[in-house]
C-alpha cells in the first residue's frame, strides 16, 4: 500500500478471510441513491451489536479522516504528489480534502481573481466548489488521486512546463565531493619508444548551506616527461535570487556570450538565470561531433580550460552531455589518435536569436578582474552590463557595454519574431582598444542571426549567423595580450610542440564569420544534419573552416550512419577530411525470445562496424561486439578488431564498464601497429556526500542532485536508473536532477525485502540550481500479520479501525469474522482498536513476535483485545 494513511483489506486467496463483499455492494449502492442511505447492521451480522458504527459509509464516505499521500490532478494534469489532510467538514457534508488558499495558488488556481479566497485564513480549508462556479473536487480512492476540476478561466496563464516558485526547494545542508579519474599506460615493444603514460583527475567539491552554494573545481594531471600539476579551475559562492529570477555569483565564473565574447573573471556577477524559465522558453546546448580513426582520446576545451575528456572507439562520435563551464565561448576539440597524432578543430557555441517574451527583462551586471589560463595574457579589472527587454509586436531590444583600462565597447541590437518566417536579430558593437604595442584602434562589428523550424518539412535551422568586423575592431580579450603575436600556451602545455590552433596575431584581426546548423527529418527514411563555420581575417587569405555532414537511418533493426568531417585552421597547410560509414545490428534478435536474459532483463547485444577514409586515402576498418550484462544491465563489455591500410597494421581493443551503487568503473586495453603499441586505460568516478543523517557514497554527481532517505529499505533499486540502489542504511544519491523542474523519484517496490512496505513509492521534488534535495520514503520494516481477534471470547466488531500505537499512519479494518491484516509491524507492540467514539468502544491488543514470524511471508495468529 503506497499511502500515508494505511487501511489494509484482507487477502481473498489461500484460505485467508476477505473483506465482506456485501459492504462493497451496499456502499456502491449508497453513492447512487437519491434518498438518505441507511445500512442495516443485521445484513452484516445476526447480532447488530457486533457491527461497528457505519454512519460514515451512510454519508457516502469511502475513507476515514486522516492524512493521505495522494496525486493531485488539476484539470487532468498531475501537478503534485504530497500529503493531504482529509477532515470532516460538517456531519452533513462529511469528509473532504482540506485545501488551503495557499496550496490552491501553488497548484495554479488563480485565487487572486476571486475575492472570497482573500477573506479566508491562510490555514483554513477553502470551499473551492462554493467559491468558483463549476469547480469540483473528487477523491479517487482506488488510485489515490485527488482530482480537481476548475474552469480554464480560473487557471493562471503560464508557459508550458511552468512550476511555481512556491514549490522550489533549496535543499538540505551538505558537503559534496565528486571525483573522476582516468589513466592510460602505454607499453611499447620497441626499445627506442617512449612511454606514453597519462593521468587525469577532476575534483568537484562544494558546500550547500541553505540557498548558498560554495563550489570548487580542480584538476590534477601528469603525463610522461612532465611533472604532476594541480590546477584550480574555479572557486565561487553562488545563490539563487528568486524574486529577481536571477543568480548571484561571487568568485570565478564566466560572462554570458550573448552580446560580447564570453570571458572568464574573478569578481561579482548578478545575472538572470534562464533555468528558472519553463523549457519552452530556453535555448539549446552544444553537440560535438567528429570522427576518430582509431581508439582515441577526446579532449574538449573552452576558454583555455579542459572541461571534458573521454575515450572513444574508431568511427563517428557524438558528445551531447557536455557540462560547459560557460554559457558561451567556442569549444576546442582535440582528437588524439592511438599513434599520438592530434587533430583539432573549433566548434562554435552561440545562442539563437536573442528574443524574449513580451515584458520579460533579462540582465547581467559584472564587476571583476579578467581571469586567464594563458601565459600570454595579463589580468586587469573590467566592468560589463547587458540588458534585454521583450517589447510588443514580437520585438526584443537589447544592449550592453564593457569598460576596462584599455578597452571601451558599447553595443545595441534588435530582434524580431517573424512568425512563420522564423526569428532574426541584428546588432552592432562599437569598440575602442589599446593593444600591447600601445597602438589605439576604433572599429565596429555587425552581427546577424536567424533561426527557423519548418515543421511541415521537418527542417530545423537551429542557428544561422554572420558577423562582420572592421579592421580596427578588437575584443576585450585581445587587449589583454602582452604581445602582438605568439603561441597561446596554457599552464602545463608542452611549449616545445606549438599548434596552429593556438597561434594568435593581433594584426590579423577577425573579419567575417559565417556559421550554420541545419537538421532535417526524412520521416521513415531517417534524418541528416549539416553544420559548418568559416572565419576570415584581415590582412591575410588564411581562414578557419569547419564543415560536418551526417545521415542516419533505420532499416528494420539495422542502424546505418554516414558522416563526413572537414576542418582546416589558418596556418595549417592541408585540410583534414574524414569520411565514415558505420552500422549496428542487435544480436539479441537472433536469440530465443524465451531467453530471460533478453526479455525480462535490461540486457542487449549488438554488433558494430565502422569504416573511415581520410583525405590521403588511408582506410581504417573496425568490427566490434558490445553486450550488457546483469539484471540491471549495469555491466557491459566491448571487443573490437580493426585494420589500418596505412602501414597495413592491425589494431584492436577490449573494454568493460561497470555502473555500481558507489561508483562507475571502466577498464580497457587496446593495441595498434600490429601490437608494437599497446595501451591500458581505466577510469573511476563517483561521489561522497556528507549530510546530517550520515555519509553517502554514490555515482557521479550532477549540478543538482537528490538524496533518497529510505531507512528500512536497504538495497532497493531506484526506478528508471541503471545500477542505482539504496545502500546498507537505505540512502543513495540520484544525480543529474533538473533544476526548477518536476523530478519524479521512485523506488522499485518489486526489489523490496518481503518484510518491508512503503507508504510512498514516489516522491516529486523541484530543486533549485545546485541543491541537494531530500526525498524521504517511509518504509515499514516488519512483519505481515493476519490476526484472528476477539474480546472476552467474542470476535471484534466488523468495521472497527485498528491502529498501531505510535504509528498513526499504520492502520487496518476488522473483517466480518473478526480478522485483521496489518503489515510493517515491529517485533513487539500494541494495537488500539476502536468501533465508536464512546469510552467503552475501545480495546488494546498487545503482541510479541518471534524472529521466524517476522521473516515469514504472512504470520497467522490469535489476538485478544483487552
From Swiss-Prot:
Entry's transmembrane regions: none
UniProt xrefs under InterPro entries: Fimb_usher, Fimbrial_membr_usher_CS, FimD_plug_dom, PapC-like_C, PapC-like_C_sf, PapC_N, PapC_N_sf
Entry-linked SUPFAM superfamilies: FimD N-terminal domain-like
The family this protein is said to belong to: Belongs to the fimbrial export usher family.
PROSITE patterns: FIMBRIAL_USHER
Tree of life domain: Bacteria
First and last residue of the signal peptide: 1-35
Keyword set, alphabetical order: Cell outer membrane, Fimbrium biogenesis, Membrane, Signal, Transmembrane, Transmembrane beta strand, Transport
Origin species: Escherichia coli O157:H7
NCBIfam families membership: PRK15193.1
Protein name (record): Probable outer membrane usher protein ElfC
GO terms of molecular function: fimbrial usher porin activity
UniProt record, GO biological process: pilus assembly
Membrane-protein topology: Multi-pass membrane protein
Induction and repression of expression: Induced in the presence of epithelial cells.
Job of this protein: Part of the elfADCG fimbrial operon, which could be required for adherence to host epithelial cells. Could be involved in the export and assembly of the ElfA fimbrial subunits across the outer membrane.
GO cellular component, one term: cell outer membrane
Localisation: Cell outer membrane
Pfam (any one): Usher
Lineage of producing organism: Bacteria, Pseudomonadati, Pseudomonadota, Gammaproteobacteria, Enterobacterales
Amino acid at each position: 500500500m503506497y499511502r500515508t494513511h494505511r487501511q489494509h483489506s484482507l487477502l481473498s486467496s489461500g484460505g485467508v478471510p476477505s473483506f465482506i463483499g456485501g459492504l462493497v455492494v451496499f456502499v456502491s449502492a449508497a453513492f447512487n441513491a437519491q434518498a438518505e442511505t441507511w445500512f442495516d447492521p443485521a445484513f452484516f451480522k445476526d447480532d447488530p451489536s457486533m457491527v461497528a458504527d457505519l454512519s460514515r459509509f451512510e454519508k457516502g464516505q469511502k475513507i476515514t479522516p486522516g492524512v493521505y499521500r495522494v496525486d493531485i490532478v488539476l484539470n487532468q494534469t498531475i501537478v503534485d504528489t504530497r500529503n493531504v489532510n482529509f477532515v470532516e467538514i460538517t456531519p452533513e457534508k462529511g469528509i473532504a480534502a482540506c485545501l488551503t488558499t495557499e496550496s490552491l495558488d501553488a497548484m495554479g488556481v488563480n485565487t487572486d481573481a476571486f475575492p472570497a479566497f482573500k477573506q479566508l485564513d491562510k490555514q483554513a480549508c477553502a470551499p473551492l466548489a462554493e467559491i468558483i462556479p463549476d469547480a469540483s473536487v473528487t477523491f479517487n480512492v482506488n488510485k489515490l488521486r485527488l482530482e480537481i476540476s476548475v474552469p480554464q478561466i480560473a487557471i493562471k496563464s503560464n508557459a508550458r512546463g511552468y512550476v511555481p516558485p512556491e514549490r522550489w526547494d533549496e535543499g538540505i545542508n551538505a558537503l559534496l565531493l565528486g571525483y573522476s579519474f582516468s589513466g592510460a599506460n602505454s607499453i611499447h615493444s620497441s626499445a627506442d619508444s617512449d612511454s606514453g603514460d597519462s593521468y587525469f583527475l577532476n575534483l568537484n567539491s562544494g558546500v550547500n548551506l541553505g540557498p548558498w552554494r560554495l563550489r570548487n573545481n580542480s584538476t590534477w594531471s601528469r603525463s610522461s616527461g612532465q611533472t604532476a600539476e594541480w590546477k584550480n579551475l574555479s572557486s565561487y559562492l553562488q545563490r539563487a535570487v528568486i524574486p529577481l529570477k536571477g543568480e548571484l555569483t561571487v568568485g570565478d565564473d564566466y560572462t554570458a556570450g550573448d552580446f560580447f565574447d564570453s570571458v572568464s573573471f574573478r569578481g561579482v556577477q548578478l545575472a538572470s538565470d534562464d533555468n528558472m524559465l519553463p523549457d519552452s522558453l530556453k535555448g539549446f546546448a552544444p553537440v560535438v561531433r567528429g570522427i576518430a580513426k582509431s581508439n582515441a582520446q577526446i579532449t574538449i576545451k573552452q576558454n583555455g580550460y579542459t572541461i571534458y575528456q573521454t575515450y572513444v572507439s574508431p568511427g563517428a562520435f557524438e558528445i551531447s552531455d557536455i557540462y560547459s563551464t560557460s554559457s558561451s565561448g567556442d569549444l576546442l576539440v582535440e582528437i588524439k589518435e592511438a599513434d599520438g597524432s592530434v587533430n583539432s578543430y573549433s566548434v562554435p557555441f552561440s545562442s539563437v536569436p536573442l528574443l524574449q517574451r513580451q515584458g520579460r527583462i533579462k540582465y547581467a551586471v559584472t564587476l571583476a578582474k579578467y581571469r586567464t589560463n594563458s601565459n600570454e595574457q595579463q589580468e586587469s579589472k573590467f566592468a560589463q552590463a547587458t540588458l534585454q527587454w521583450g517589447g510588443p509586436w514580437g520585438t526584443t531590444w537589447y544592449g550592453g557595454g564593457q569598460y576596462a583600462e584599455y578597452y571601451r565597447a558599447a553595443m545595441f541590437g534588435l530582434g524580431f519574431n517573424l512568425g512563420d518566417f522564423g526569428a532574426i536579430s541584428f546588432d552592432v558593437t562599437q569598440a575602442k582598444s589599446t593593444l600591447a604595442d600601445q597602438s589605439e584602434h576604433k572599429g565596429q562589428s555587425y552581427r546577424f542571426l536567424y533561426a527557423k523550424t519548418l515543421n511541415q518539412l521537418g527542417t530545423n535551422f537551429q542557428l544561422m549567423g554572420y558577423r562582420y568586423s572592421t579592421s580596427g575592431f578588437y575584443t576585450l580579450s585581445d587587449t589583454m595580450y602582452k604581445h602582438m603575436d605568439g603561441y597561446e600556451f596554457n599552464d602545463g602545455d608542452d611549449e616545445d610542440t606549438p599548434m596552429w590552433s593556438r597561434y594568435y596575431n593581433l594584426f590579423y584581426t577577425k573579419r567575417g564569420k559565417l556559421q550554420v546548423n541545419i537538421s532535417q527529418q526524412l520521416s521513415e527514411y531517417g534524418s541528416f544534419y549539416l553544420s559548418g563555420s568559416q572565419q576570415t581575417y584581415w590582412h591575410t587569405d588564411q581562414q578557419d573552416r569547419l564543415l560536418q555532414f551526417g545521415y542516419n537511418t533505420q532499416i528494420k533493426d539495422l542502424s546505418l550512419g554516414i558522416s563526413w568531417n572537414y576542418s582546416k585552421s589558418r596556418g595549417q597547410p592541408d585540410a583534414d577530411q574524414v569520411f565514415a560509414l558505420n552500422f549496428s545490428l542487435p544480436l539479441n534478435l537472433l536469440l530465443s525470445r524465451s531467453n530471460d536474459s533478453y526479455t525480462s532483463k535490461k540486457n542487449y547485444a549488438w554488433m558494430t562496424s565502422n569504416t573511415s577514409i581520410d583525405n590521403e586515402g588511408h582506410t581504417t576498418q573496425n568490427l566490434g561486439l558490445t553486450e550488457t550484462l546483469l539484471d540491471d544491465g549495469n555491466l557491459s563489455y566491448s571487443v573490437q578488431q580493426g585494420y589500418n591500410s596505412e602501414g597495413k597494421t592491425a589494431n584492436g581493443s577490449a573494454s568493460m564498464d561497470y555502473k555500481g551503487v558507489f561508483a562507475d568503473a571502466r577498464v580497457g586495453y587496446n593495441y595498434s601497429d600490429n601490437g608494437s603499441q599497446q595501451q591500458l586505460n581505466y577510469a573511476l568516478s563517483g561521489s561522497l556526500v556528507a549530510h546530517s543523517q550520515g555519509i553517502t557514497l554514490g555515482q557521479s554527481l550532477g549540478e543538482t542532485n537528490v538524496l533518497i532517505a529510505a531507512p528500512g529499505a536497504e538495497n532497493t533499486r531506484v526506478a528508471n536508473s541503471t545500477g542505482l540502489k539504496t545502500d546498507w542504511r537505505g540512502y543513495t544519491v540520484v544525480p543529474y536532477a533538473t533544476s526548477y523542474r518536476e523530478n519524479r523519484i521512485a523506488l522499485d517496490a518489486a526489489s523490496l525485502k518481503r518484510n518491508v512496505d512503503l507508504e510512498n513509492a514516489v516522491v516529486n521534488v523541484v530543486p533549485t540550481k545546485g541543491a541537494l534535495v531530500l526525498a524521504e520514503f517511509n518504509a515499514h520494516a516488519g512483519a505481515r500479520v493476519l490476526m484472528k481477534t476477539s474480546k472476552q471470547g467474542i470476535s471484534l466488531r466488523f468495521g472497527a479501525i485498528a491502529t498501531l500505537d505510535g504509528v498513526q499512519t499504520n492502520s487496518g479494518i476488522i473483517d466480518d469474522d473478526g480478522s485483521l491484516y496489518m503489515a510493517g509491524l515491529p517485533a513487539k507492540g500494541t494495537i488500539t482498536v476502536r468501533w465508536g467514539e464512546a469510552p467503552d468502544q475501545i480495546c488494546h491488543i498487545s503482541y510479541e513476535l518471534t524472529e521466524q514470524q517476522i521473516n515469514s511471508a504472512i504470520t497467522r495468529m490469535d489476538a485478544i483485545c483487552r
